[in-house]
C-alpha cells in the first residue's frame, strides 16, 4: 500500500509489551515486515523501563534503532517521571533520541470524570477533558526532566501554543529540544467535534 501511494520508506513503532523485552518487540515487528516492498525501519516504543530494558539499548543500537518513544499517558504504555529521566540518560549514551507523548494522565482522567458527570459522553466532551494546560504542563515537566538528565528530547504531535511556549522556554535556557506537530492541529479546530461525524476527529491530544 505504501509503495502504491508513492511512499518508499516507512518507520513504524515497534512497541514493547509490559513484561516483554525490546528485542522481542523488534523481532515481532521484523516478522510483520517480512515481504515488505519498501524500505523500512523501526522506532522502539518503551512500555516498561527497568534494568533489563536499559541493558538492551546497546543491542538495539547494533540493530540500527536510534529513537525511542515514551508515553506519559495510557495505562498499558505510560512510564513515570523517574523512568523518563533514566531513559533520557541511557539513550543519550547510545546517541539515541527519546520522543515523548506529553499529557498529564492523572489530571485528564479526573477531567474525564467531571465531563461525564455533566452528561457529556460524546465527541464534544473530548477536548473538554484534555484542554491545552493538560499538554502544556506535561511538556514543561518533560523539559525540566530533560534538563536534569542533560539530554536532548523530542516532543511528538505537539498540539497547543501553550506547549510550544514551554518548549521555547527550554530552548532559551540552552536545551536541545525538537518538536513536531501534525496537519490536523494546524488546519482543524475543536469545532469539528460538534459535527454529526465528530467521532472521526477524536484523537489525543485533541483538536
Where are these regions (language model features)?
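Metal-associated gating/positioning segment near the N- to mid-region
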Residues: 1-35, 52
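Structured loop/turn residues at beta-strand edges in well-structured enzyme cores
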Residues: 5, 38, 63
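Active-site neighborhood of phospho(di)ester-bond hydrolases with catalytic His/Asp-centered motifs
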Residues: 11-14, 18-19, 41-44, 156-157
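Alpha-helix-loop-beta-strand connector modules within alpha/beta enzyme cores
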Residues: 22-39, 85-100
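Glycine-rich, flexible loop/turn motifs
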Residues: 36, 42, 199, 203
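Active-site beta->alpha loop and helix N-cap motifs at the rims of alpha/beta catalytic domains
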Residues: 46-51
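Histidine/acidic residue-rich metal-binding segments in metalloenzymes
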Residues: 52-207
Amino acid at each position: 500500500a505504501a509503495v502504491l501511494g508513492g511512499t518508499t520508506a516507512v518507520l513504524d513503532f515497534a512497541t514493547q509489551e509490559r513484561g516483554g523485552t525490546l528485542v522481542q518487540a523488534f523481532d515481532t515487528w521484523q516478522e510483520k515486515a517480512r515481504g515488505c516492498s519498501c524500505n523500512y525501519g523501526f522506532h522502539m516504543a518503551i512500555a516498561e523501563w527497568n534494568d533489563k530494558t536499559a541493558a538492551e539499548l546497546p543491542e538495539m543500537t547494533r540493530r540500527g534503532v536510534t529513537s525511542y518513544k515514551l508515553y506519559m499517558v495510557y495505562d498499558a504504555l505510560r512510564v513515570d517521571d523517574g523512568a523518563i529521566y533514566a531513559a533520557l540518560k541511557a539513550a543519550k549514551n547510545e546517541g539515541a533520541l527519546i520522543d515523548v507523548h506529553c499529557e498529564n494522565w492523572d489530571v485528564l482522567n479526573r477531567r474525564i470524570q467531571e465531563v461525564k458527570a455533566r452528561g457529556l459522553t460524546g465527541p464534544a466532551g473530548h477536548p473538554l477533558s484534555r484542554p491545552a494546560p493538560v499538554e502544556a504542563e506535561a511538556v514543561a515537566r518533560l523539559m525540566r526532566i530533560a534538563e536534569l538528565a542533560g539530554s536532548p528530547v523530542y516532543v511528538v504531535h505537539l498540539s497547543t501554543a501553550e506547549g510550544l511556549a514551554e518548549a521555547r522556554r527550554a530552548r532559551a535556557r540552552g536545551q536541545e529540544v525538537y518538536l513536531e506537530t501534525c496537519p490536523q492541529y494546524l488546519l482543524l479546530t475543536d469545532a469539528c467535534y460538534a459535527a454529526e461525524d465528530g467521532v472521526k476527529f477524536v484523537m489525543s491530544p485533541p483538536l
